[in-house]
């Protein structure tokens, strides 16, 4: 390797380190419990599936997407458990078969006649993200640092084993604030996530290789016991 190539590689490494540090610090303003940045990608756009209309709706969230480890060791609450919902963590703020034929990043996703479909037994539709409240069990977070307006998008990520244990060992809280196991898959150019409130989001990621990487990371986080740190 030539001196010029080595210098270029070192410069790229330093730039990546700077970006990670910057993203960590920015996320920390919104979520002080951030512990470790696990992955980030420079540009993502967000869609939400409308169960009633059977179509994707493009949301006003575009920017850096990051997935990170959170410190939940203090066993604190996000909000008091209440039968009434109040927005806090998810900010926009079964077996599911998802088909997305048009993978381009444009507003045509919200046309029900273009072959896009999400089939589910759930007939509910929500106008905004549901609340995550009660005991803070959200081991991981996903955030889009929005370039369009001041509102960021965030989503709590919890291993499915934690959700299932909550149903058994904390049934009262689960009754007041029920959570469902999350799911993730990648279809065409969307990473599709079913969140804890059974809402479905599609994330279009500009960097092609990052789509599979983000899918595999979220899948790993959901299918394994929570970790305190990653090497």
UniProtKB/Swiss-Prot annotation:
Region annotation (Disordered) maps to 92-120
A single Gene Ontology CC annotation of this entry is:
cytoplasmic side of membrane
Annotated consequence of substituting residue 47 to A: In DCP1-32; partial loss of mRNA decapping activity
The impact of changing residue 47 to F is:
In DCP1-35; partial loss of mRNA decapping activity
Q: Which UniProt keywords apply?
A: Cytoplasm, mRNA processing, Nonsense-mediated mRNA decay, Phosphoprotein, RNA-binding
Listed result of changing residue 70 to A:
In DCP1-33; strong loss of mRNA decapping activity
Positions with biased composition (Low complexity): 101-120
CDD domains cross-referenced by the UniProt entry: Dcp1
Q: Which GO terms describe its biological process?
A: deadenylation-dependent decapping of nuclear-transcribed mRNA; deadenylation-independent decapping of nuclear-transcribed mRNA; mRNA processing; nuclear-transcribed mRNA catabolic process, nonsense-mediated decay
**SUPFAM superfamilies linked to this entry:** PH domain-like (SSF50729)
InterPro entries tied to this protein:
Dcp1 (IPR010334), PH-like_dom_sf (IPR011993)
| Posttranslational modification | Phosphorylated.
Q: Name one GO molecular function term.
A: enzyme activator activity
Which Gene3D superfamilies does the record associate with it? Pleckstrin-homology domain (PH domain)/Phosphotyrosine-binding domain (PTB)
Q: Where in the cell is it found?
A: Cytoplasm, P-body
Extra info from the record?
Answer: Present with 2880 molecules/cell in log phase SD medium.
Subunit structure, per the record?
A: Component of the decapping complex composed of DCP1 and DCP2. Interacts with mRNAs, DHH1, LSM1, LSM2, LSM3, LSM4, LSM5, LSM6, LSM7, and the cap-binding proteins PAB1 and TIF4632/eIF-4G.
Instruction: Write out the function statement from the record.
Output: Component of the decapping complex necessary for the degradation of mRNAs, both in normal mRNA turnover and in nonsense-mediated mRNA decay. Removes the 7-methyl guanine cap structure from mRNA molecules, yielding a 5'-phosphorylated mRNA fragment and 7m-GDP. Decapping is the major pathway of mRNA degradation in yeast. It occurs through deadenylation, decapping and subsequent 5' to 3' exonucleolytic decay of the transcript body. DCP1 is activated by the DEAD-box helicase DHH1 and destabilizes the eIF-4F cap-binding complex from the mRNA.
Q: Which family does it belong to?
A: Belongs to the DCP1 family.
Question: Matching PANTHER family, A to Z?
Answer: DECAPPING PROTEIN 1, ISOFORM A, TRANSCRIPTION FACTOR SMIF DECAPPING ENZYME DCP1
Q: What is this protein called?
A: mRNA-decapping enzyme subunit 1
- Can you name the source organism? Saccharomyces cerevisiae (strain ATCC 204508 / S288c) (Baker's yeast)
Instruction: List the top taxonomic levels of the source.
Output: Eukaryota, Fungi, Dikarya, Ascomycota, Saccharomycotina
Q: What is the gene called?
A: DCP1
